[in-house]
């Protein structure tokens, strides 16, 4: 047993915290950086969703690589990549440069996350201590994501948008030597199977498909867009075929033949996607439409993210008491009702009502994520628990990335249709960030007219998308109720 095991836990939690904070901190900074970099609507979406998309494809292979060459080594490399990418992101001078930096952050995160969990399990040999350590990891995970918007708001109140990335650097400078000193080295298992080619196929397929979807919504189905979509979907189909035919796949898709696992993965995908997509769009409405400062926007969003963090632990107790089927389906139904009610609410005049609705939404999605985990892990055979966990973590990250894409392209598409360009300025109907940039540059009464028209169009788009997503989640609630009809009361995982 490691004598310094609790210090090792502190070290890996320090390494883990920036990763989870980075999942939400950028939402608050998007309006500021979009204007500063002159980012288009599609570029804004890439800045946000490239991070979880890269993570979704690399989490499993990076975990396997760490098994092969040692967790300490991969963790240190991941921390170095994360720190360097944070510097590159903070000082990016263009949207494409920031997108590349965010992709590098995703690579660093995909190296850090599996090592953190593996080191906890390796360091704490006593079952009771390991459970305590994993509980601390869970709290840090939820709290980090919850405080992200607030931390972002505080930083942007005093510094420029790059500060939300630069804040990672001093943490890395402390964590790297601490990990080097405290975490013991290990030789790893050279027999562990590592298949980087499959990961590259998955990441390339995801990026090309998402690019095609975004381009198609913005400019229509051109030849270039159609070819991109065809290649992207083809790569994803190829990846799926490899997984099904392989004796040792990167992701065991055969688990999806079990209805509870399939619907659980769908819940993880939808819940994480809805939370991420809604946070992004809400942050833009609060700052662009309602003229709130980043700090005010962060405080406004706090009920949502805190309730989501609380929903997970409470969801396990609810599932044990009332059964997985009832809790899973009702959490999705509550989320759908909350989204629909928010779409009808005035965020200014009904601020307190909206705050309550945000609590309901966040709590419901948090419970839904925990219920999805119980459905997946509780239905997987014991010998495939690791494969089920890999499928769940990939689905969670993929849901976050694609949720942002879906929310973003729908909002931008409806915004373009609803926008009445009073001055006929170029580009202002593409996205609200481009419209607000143009309004500031033009100034005067013309600039004011553009800003007013953009705000009205975005508010309409936001409300319409919330109704669409609410309807989708309501259908999922019914599907969950049907698919989990034989699910017993389950212990939380």
List each language-model region with its residue ranges.
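Central cavity-lining transmembrane alpha-helices of secondary-active solute carriers
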Residues: 49-63, 113-117, 302-314
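12-transmembrane solute porter fold
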Residues: 5-21, 26-28, 37, 41, ...
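Structural signature of transmembrane alpha-helices in multi-pass secondary transporters
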Residues: 19, 48-51, 55, 106, ...
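Interfacial helix-cap and linker-helix signal at transmembrane-aqueous boundaries
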Residues: 33-34, 65-66, 151-159, 213, ...
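Small-residue-rich packing faces within the transmembrane alpha-helices of Major Facilitator Superfamily
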Residues: 56, 83-84, 169-176, 236, ...
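Intrinsic disorder in cytosolic terminal tails and internal cytosolic loops
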Residues: 1-2, 444-453, 483-493
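Hydrophobic transmembrane-helix bundles of small-molecule transporters
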Residues: 135, 157-269, 274, 281, ...
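Helix-loop-helix hairpins in multi-pass membrane proteins, especially solute transporters
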Residues: 64-197, 348
């Amino acid at each position: 047993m490691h004598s310094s095991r609790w210090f090792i836990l502190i070290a890996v939690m320090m390494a883990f915290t920036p990763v989870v904070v980075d999942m939400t901190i950028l939402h608050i900074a998007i309006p500021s950086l979009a204007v500063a970099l002159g980012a288009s609507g599609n570029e804004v979406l890439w800045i946000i969703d490239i991070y979880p998309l890269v993570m979704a494809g690399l989490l499993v292979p990076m975990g396997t690589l760490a098994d092969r060459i040692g967790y300490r080594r991969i963790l240190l490399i991941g921390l170095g990549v994360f720190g360097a990418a944070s510097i590159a992101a903070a000082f990016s001078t263009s949207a494409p440069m920031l997108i590349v930096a965010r992709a590098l952050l995703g690579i660093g995160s995909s190296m850090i996350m599996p090592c953190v969990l593996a080191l906890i399990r390796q360091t704490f040999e006593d079952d009771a201590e390991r459970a305590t350590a994993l509980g601390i990891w869970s709290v840090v995970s939820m709290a980090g994501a919850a405080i992200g918007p607030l931390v972002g708001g505080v930083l942007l109140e005093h510094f420029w948008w790059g500060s939300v990335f630069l804040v990672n650097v001093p943490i890395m400078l402390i964590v790297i030597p601490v990990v080097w000193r405290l975490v013991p080295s290990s030789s790893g298992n050279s027999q562990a199977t590592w298949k980087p080619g499959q990961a590259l196929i998955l990441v390339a397929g995801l990026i090309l498909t998402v690019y095609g979807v975004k381009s198609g919504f913005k400019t229509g189905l051109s030849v270039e867009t159609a070819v991109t979509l065809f290649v992207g979907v083809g790569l994803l189909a190829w990846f799926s075929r490899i997984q099904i035919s392989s004796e040792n796949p990167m992701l065991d898709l055969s688990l999806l033949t079990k209805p509870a696992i399939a619907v659980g993965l769908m819940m993880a995908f939808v819940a994480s996607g809805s939370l991420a997509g809604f946070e992004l769009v809400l942050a833009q409405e609060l700052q662009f439409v309602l003229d709130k400062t980043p700090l005010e926007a962060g405080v406004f969003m706090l009920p949502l993210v805190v309730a989501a963090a609380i929903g997970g632990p409470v969801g396990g107790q609810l599932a044990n008491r009332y059964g997985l089927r009832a809790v899973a389906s009702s959490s999705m139904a509550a989320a759908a009702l909350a989204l629909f009610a928010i779409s009808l609410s005035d965020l200014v005049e009904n601020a307190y009502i909206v705050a309550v609705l945000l609590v309901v939404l966040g709590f419901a999605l948090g419970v839904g994520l925990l219920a999805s985990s119980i459905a997946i892990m509780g239905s997987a055979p014991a010998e495939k628990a690791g494969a089920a966990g890999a499928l769940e973590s990939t689905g969670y990250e993929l849901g976050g990335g694609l949720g942002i894409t879906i929310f973003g392209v729908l909002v931008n598409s409806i915004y373009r249709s609803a926008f009445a360009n009073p001055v006929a300025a170029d580009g202002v109907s593409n996205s609200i960030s481009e419209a607000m940039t143009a309004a500031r540059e033009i100034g005067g009464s013309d600039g004011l007219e553009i800003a007013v028209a953009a705000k009205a169009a975005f508010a309409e788009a936001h409300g319409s998308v919330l109704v669409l997503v609410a309807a989708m989640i309501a259908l999922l609630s019914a599907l969950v109720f049907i698919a989990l009809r034989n699910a017993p009361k389950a212990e939380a995982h």
